[in-house]
Structure formats: structure tokens, C-alpha cells
């Protein structure tokens, strides 16, 4: 397979999995077993494509918040986004300084996919018994920030899955409201993570030699795919549960665990 096709597929995969509750990092680590390992810079660029995608998909909400800060409800919402982001940033930096690194084997990812799928089924079952609420509390904001760190430490967990379902269990029980808040928190989180990674790369000697055609194709693929996925998902969850994603995670995790001994 050519490097260009590989880059295209990885970009599409990033766009497909970044916002679905199935773990983009986990899927990229799995895909690299067949498509080849890419540079950290390449991975940062395709995540930037996903960032652009969600900004475009949520542009109306972003504009409403930016121009409506005079309203107390909008200020409160933005402050809670900020708190969730700060929790992620501070705890994430502590974890990073402690020497955490992504796993180089598939087994931890497989277990995270499997356990995360079960967690989704259980969490949605109990959240479904709560009265439907769309108010973001400070408790929810802090929990979402912590959930993002957990997802970063355990690839395969999924940032959106862990954060959305924890938010639902803690009172933000309306699925669409929980997803909206988690996606909004994801924007500064992904911006900061990408910026921090680029700064670290620069300090260590630059970005190395890259095939800019491959990088550009992957970026565009991630942006376009991510935009379509976000718009579709936000419509889907208004009428449907996350069950199909939970079942997919369980099946994929189990299949990988069965495949690993044979491989």
C-alpha cells in the first residue's frame, strides 16, 4: 500500500473515531499495526483536522456563546467549559511529567475497548432512570475534566465516551446536552494538547522531514470526515441510545484479545 493511501486512510479513521465514543487513539494504534507507524507530527496534524471539523460543526453555538457573554447563562456555560479544561490541563500535565507514554502493544487498548463498552451499557442504563436534565453543574464540569485525563491515560477508553456517560450519571442526563458540553470542552483541550506537543517537538529539534502531500491529504480527510461525523452524531443521539457503539467496542475488544495469542 502506498504511503499516500495509508495517510488518507489514517486521516479518515481519525475523523471517524475522534468524536464517536469508540476511541480515536485506540483505533489509530490498531491501524498502525497494518498501515505503519507515523510520526508524532503527522498525528498532531490529523488531530488538528478534527479540531477544525468540530469548530465548523459547532460554529453556531460557538458564535452564540462568543457574542452572548452578556447573558448570565452563556457566561456560566463558558466558565464551566473553562473549569473542565483547566482540570484536564493541570492533571494531564502532572501525568505527563510523571513519565506516562502511550502503550506500544494492542492488548491494553483491547481491554480498554471491551471494559469501556460494558461501562457504556451500564452507565446508560442507570442514567436512563434519571429525570432528563440539561443543566451543566460544577460537579459535572470537574468530572468531565477528570474523565478526559482518564481517557488519555488509557487509550481505547474514549474521551467522549468516558466524559459523556460520567456527565449523564452526575445529573446532565439529557444525552444531547451531555454530548454538546463534552464536545465544547474538547475544543480547547485538543487545541492545547496539540500546541503542547508541537512545542515539545520544537524544543527537541524540530519536526523532522515530512511528506507534506501525505500530511495535507490526511489533514483534509480528517477535517471532512470529522465534520460529517459530528453533525450526524448530534442528530443521531437525539433519538437513539449509544448501545450500538457499546456493542461494537465489546466485539472489537474481544476479537482483538482472541487474535493477540494467535498473532
Swiss-Prot record:
Annotated Gene Ontology cellular component terms: plasma membrane
Catalytic activity: di-trans,octa-cis-undecaprenyl diphosphate + H2O = di-trans,octa-cis-undecaprenyl phosphate + phosphate + H(+)
Function noted in UniProt: Catalyzes the dephosphorylation of undecaprenyl diphosphate (UPP). Confers resistance to bacitracin.
Localization (cell): Cell inner membrane
Top-level division of the source organism's lineage: Bacteria
Encoding gene, per UniProt annotation: uppP
Molecular function GO labels: undecaprenyl-diphosphatase activity
Enzyme Commission no: 3.6.1.27
Transmembrane segments: 38-58, 75-95, 108-128, 135-155, 181-201, 217-237, 242-262
Gene Ontology BP term (one): peptidoglycan metabolic process
Keywords: Antibiotic resistance, Cell inner membrane, Cell membrane, Cell shape, Cell wall biogenesis/degradation, Hydrolase, Membrane, Peptidoglycan synthesis, Transmembrane, Transmembrane helix
Class of enzymatic activity (EC top level): hydrolase
Note in the entry: Bacitracin is thought to be involved in the inhibition of peptidoglycan synthesis by sequestering undecaprenyl diphosphate, thereby reducing the pool of lipid carrier available.
NCBIfam families: PRK00281.1-4 (NF001390)
Topology of the protein relative to the lipid bilayer: Multi-pass membrane protein
Protein name: Undecaprenyl-diphosphatase
Family classification: Belongs to the UppP family.
